[in-house]
Amino acid sequence: MPRKRLRAVLFGPQGSGKGTQGRMLADYFGVPLIGSGELFRAEIQEKTALGKLVKSYVGRGALVPDELVNAVVQKQLKAIAVDRGFLLDGYPRNVEQAESLDKVVKINLALQIKIGDDESLRRLLGRRQCTGCKTIFHI
């Protein structure tokens, strides 16, 4: 019987370490880590139709609507071999997004990282980004 591949979602508040833990889990299981933020940046940089729509919201500091978030994530899921597995970082964020995802692929694991509000705030206040290379680091 073939081994079931990881098709998982990773949840947690900002500063909880989703990105760090997600990279380690994705490496361990040999699956791609898919984060909506990275997908948004790629779509914007490539100047796709979706990217232009995303930029219109991100540029003014507005939340990207669920329909658009779903379209960006589903585009990526269609581009990879989902039967080989994947790990979604921070998506879905609500019931509408979860229902949309469920129509495309079945998730077999959900992981939640819990962290206190004070610790989350401490970590976020210590987060910095290099203006040149865009690397995020902590002080």
Predicted regions and their residues:
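Glycine-rich phosphate-binding loop of ATP-dependent small-molecule kinases
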Residues: 1-139
